[in-house]
């Protein structure tokens, strides 16, 4: 939670800023959804680019709203944030299946074709097919459309006042401070004990910071994009580490289900585990790169609207 209480003027500006974030999200989600449905009609059931845009748009507004609720708890949007999280899950699972397909195919190509590798590729294809079907079905689900309706209804409760960047900057700066503090806490935990789940939590907090910083770039000015780019460098490294973790875990599971594949899956899983461990040792440098960013004061500092 925020360590300051937002005063009445500040609450109005919070809501104006949030309305802008929601407006952008609705446009992005609607555009991506339209592209996915058009691709379906044209016979392309996967539409990976549009699905990716849809997944990112949903996750971005979820993270942005979660942080703004920390800035001003009177927004009372916990249920909406939870709904957006659930709505995004099938698309995240499809993304994991796509990463799995690409990683396993790459590793097996280097090893050469065997009956076991062919069977493993079939299992990977089955996993991807199930994830694809689940995301397709989710697009037509009542839950998906109800959550998007809830998002729009929330938007309609927000003020339509116009505010200048100068008026909005103190609130935007404080929002970035809130998410930056959560990033630093997550990094401290990950440095103390470099477990997969702590690195994953850090990656999520970094994404919170990226999405919010870019969402308010028109208020914060050009230095905010440099800050976001540094965060993205860290996010991508942590993302690759997490991908190796996911692939290694899946291979262990499938090896338990198919005894004939276990020698191969154990071997490939070990390779992925080593890559994950290597990634877990590499994040200190990009983290320092983020911490060395000097114009943070212009991105984060100001308390004018806080009591």
Language-model regions: role of each:
Residues 1-307:
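Cationic, histidine-enriched alpha-helical/coil surfaces that engage anionic ligands
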């Amino acid at each position: 939670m925020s360590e300051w209480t937002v005063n009445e003027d500040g609450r109005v500006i919070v809501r104006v800023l949030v309305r802008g974030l929601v407006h952008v999200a609705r446009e992005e989600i609607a555009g991506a959804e339209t592209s996915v449905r058009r691709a379906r009609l044209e016979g392309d059931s996967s539409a990976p680019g549009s699905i990716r845009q849809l997944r990112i748009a949903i996750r971005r507004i979820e993270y942005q709203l979660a942080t703004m609720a920390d800035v001003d708890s009177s927004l009372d949007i916990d249920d909406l944030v939870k709904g957006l999280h659930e709505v995004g899950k099938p698309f995240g699972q499809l993304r994991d299946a796509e990463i799995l397909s690409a990683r396993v195919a790459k590793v097996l190509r280097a090893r050469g074709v065997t009956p076991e590798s062919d069977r493993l590729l079939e299992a990977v294809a089955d996993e991807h097919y199930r994830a694809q079907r689940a995301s397709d079905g989710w697009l037509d689900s009542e839950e998906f459309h109800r959550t998007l309706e809830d998002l729009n209804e929330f938007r309609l409760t927000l003020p339509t006042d116009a505010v200048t960047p100068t008026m909005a900057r103190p609130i935007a700066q404080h929002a970035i401070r809130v998410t930056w503090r959560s990033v630093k806490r997550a990094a401290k935990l990950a440095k103390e004990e470099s477990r997969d789940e702590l690195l994953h939590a850090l990656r999520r907090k970094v994404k919170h910071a990226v999405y919010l910083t870019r969402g308010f770039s028109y208020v914060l000015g050009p230095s905010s994009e440099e800050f976001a780019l540094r965060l993205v460098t860290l996010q991508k490294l942590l993302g690759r580490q997490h991908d190796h973790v996911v692939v290694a875990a899946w291979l262990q599971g499938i090896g338990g289900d198919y005894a004939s594949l276990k020698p191969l899956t154990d071997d490939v899983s070990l390779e992925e585990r080593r890559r994950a461990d290597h990634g877990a040792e590499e994040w200190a440098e990009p983290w320092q790169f983020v911490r060395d960013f000097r114009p943070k004061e212009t991105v984060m500092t100001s308390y004018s609207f806080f009591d």
